[in-house]
Amino acid sequence: GKIQAHHQYHWNGSWDWDEVSTPILMPVERQGRTIDALVHPGRNGYLWTLERSADDISFVDAEPYVYQNAFASLDPETGRPTYDPKHKPTTGSTTSFCPSLWGGKDWPPAAYNPESGLLYIPANDNHCGVIEGREVTYMPGSAYMGARTQMTVPEGADHIGEIQAWDMNTGEEVWTREFDSHNWGGILTTSGCLLYT
């Protein structure tokens, strides 16, 4: 009944990028060996690969799968991000950041197909946000957010929604299907490599 291991994708987050989907269990090739991986397209816009064992979870690598400007870098050993202070919301300021508080992937599930070896992600790219942090007084029965939020699309963006296919053995995106509007559809993949979304 106790937590045996964990990995924190980012710390002290003020973007509302809590993770709402479970990682996908799959074998992944890295540096000549097969690892038991936890793969997770995070709301923060990064595609995370972690190694799992009975009593440990360790960072392997992470790559942005949508445009992301809040992280300046990731520590290559731990995966801990360094934040770009221009894109970290704080009380008393108005801050723009990408992806939006809905994330690069929100509730809709991604899917892995062992036949194709591909991970399929329902993503929203070119979807950013603005948060105006402000002091609030708690009032029972009222929203207690401490922020005013707005969703934005960068000038010149030609799409938002995507279905992405990633080869997790190479860590590379294989193909993308773009949509003019958001993609809120989950993905199911079958034997024979059909995709339903």
Language-model segments: residues:
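Extracytoplasmic beta-rich repeat domains
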Residues: 5-25, 63-109, 137-148, 157-160, ...
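Long hydrophobic segments that form regular secondary structure
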Residues: 98-139, 158, 165-172
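Conserved small/polar residues in nucleotide/adenosyl-binding loops
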Residues: 196-197
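A short loop-to-beta-strand structural motif that recurs across blades of beta-propeller domains
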Residues: 46, 162-164
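Short coil/turn segments that connect the beta-strands within blades of beta-propeller domains
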Residues: 35-36, 117, 192-193
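Short coil/turn linkers that define WD40 beta-propeller blade boundaries
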Residues: 1-2, 55-57, 117, 171
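Phosphate/diphosphate-binding loops
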Residues: 24-56, 60-65, 92-96
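Short, solvent-exposed loop/turn segments at conserved positions within beta-propeller repeat blades
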Residues: 40-43, 155-159
